[in-house]
């Protein structure tokens, strides 16, 4: 519990420094990665991963989202096109609220996840924390 409190405090600091553009990129990441998921906590869980990585790697939330090969939704590199697509998604405002709300702890501190139909090489070296919808989370 103590670790979660430390991460929460640091994550709140990350959130308080979000510019409008950073907020849009993080919100778009939630939509593009989990907007089609209707499992409770799916978008919050992706948000947790972003914040946990930002804290752990000392990066901005936007830098975490746009890191090469980290979130498959951005792999094409067509940021403007993908951002416009995400903004048209019916759950855009829901995702925006998540981005500007206090972090949750659905994933138990996860900083990695993958879809349940994949078997990435790195999964066996991490501790599985939870499955939410079609995503499996690890730390």
Model region roles, listed by residue range:
Residues 2-9:
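Sec-dependent signal peptide recognition
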Residues 21-139:
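Bacterial extracytoplasmic/cell-wall-associated proteins, especially those involved in peptidoglycan
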